[in-house]
């Protein structure tokens, strides 16, 4: 029996060439509502989980994107990017802003895809309705250009593409399983390496930090629901429509 991933892959790419299939997959995954409530139990099951739940965070969404892109014989790796949830461009309500300021460093997941001699960032994190709250939604991706990063990396605003053919060999080191990336980004050939790296980073969090993260996740998801309903939360009891 075909898996949920196989069914959606066929639905999203039927009668399309490789380029149009790639863009279609990206747009469908981007449009899946972002949510922190769907746990990442296993990188291998995450693609199915996000389709079944109909929502998901950056991890499941990009595991799904990578799996589908690889079905098109595209070269894809994972990009883990360190960031802070306390992004000044996001129109947080005051209480959520206070929570975000207390959180430890977080780790975003996106993909890098090979286009000629370049490895471009492909980030399908935020669904379009979230743009009104300041989220950098990638509305119109052409399948060739670098997308906007969903978060602000801690050391650089944007990861520059690897676009110098003379540097490909030195920047793409198979032994190290990484590209020449800024301090805030770590690249991974596969899900296992990414999961190992991620757990190494988050396992140092204190019980207090974990409780703050859980509280933030609940309130963040509730706020996103209001944003999608065109209710931008400004202050207790005050919504802008």
Task: Say what each PLM segment does.
Residues 1-56:
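Secondary-structure boundary elements
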Residues 25, 29, 69, 76-78, ...:
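Generic structural hydrophobic/aromatic packing signal, biased to beta-strands
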Residues 17, 34, 83-241:
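His-Asp-centered catalytic microenvironments across diverse enzyme cores
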Residues 40-102:
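Active-site neighborhood of thiol-dependent amide/isopeptide-bond enzymes
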């Amino acid at each position: 029996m075909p898996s949920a991933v196989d069914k959606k892959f066929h639905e999203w790419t039927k009668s399309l060439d490789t380029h149009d299939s790639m863009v279609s997959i990206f747009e469908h995954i981007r449009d899946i509502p972002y949510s922190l409530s769907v746990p990442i139990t296993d990188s291998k099951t995450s693609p199915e989980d996000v389709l079944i739940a109909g929502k998901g965070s950056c991890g499941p969404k990009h595991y799904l994107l990578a799996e589908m892109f690889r079905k098109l014989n595209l070269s894809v790796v994972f990009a883990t990017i360190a960031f802070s949830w306390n992004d000044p461009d996001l129109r947080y309500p005051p209480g959520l802003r206070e929570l975000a300021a207390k959180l430890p460093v977080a780790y975003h997941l996106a993909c890098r895809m090979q286009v000629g001699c370049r490895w471009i960032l492909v980030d399908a994190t935020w669904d379009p309705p979230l743009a009104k709250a300041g989220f950098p939604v990638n509305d119109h991706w052409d399948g060739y250009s670098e997308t906007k990063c969903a978060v602000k990396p801690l050391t650089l605003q944007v990861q520059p593409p690897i676009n110098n053919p003379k540097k490909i060999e030195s920047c793409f080191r198979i032994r190290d399983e990484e590209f020449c990336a800024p301090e805030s980004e770590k690249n991974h050939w596969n899900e296992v390496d990414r999961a190992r790296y991620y757990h190494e980073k988050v396992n140092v969090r204190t019980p207090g930090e974990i409780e703050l993260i859980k509280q933030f996740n609940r309130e963040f998801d509730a706020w996103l629901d209001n944003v999608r309903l065109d209710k931008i939360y400004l202050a207790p009891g005050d919504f802008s429509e």
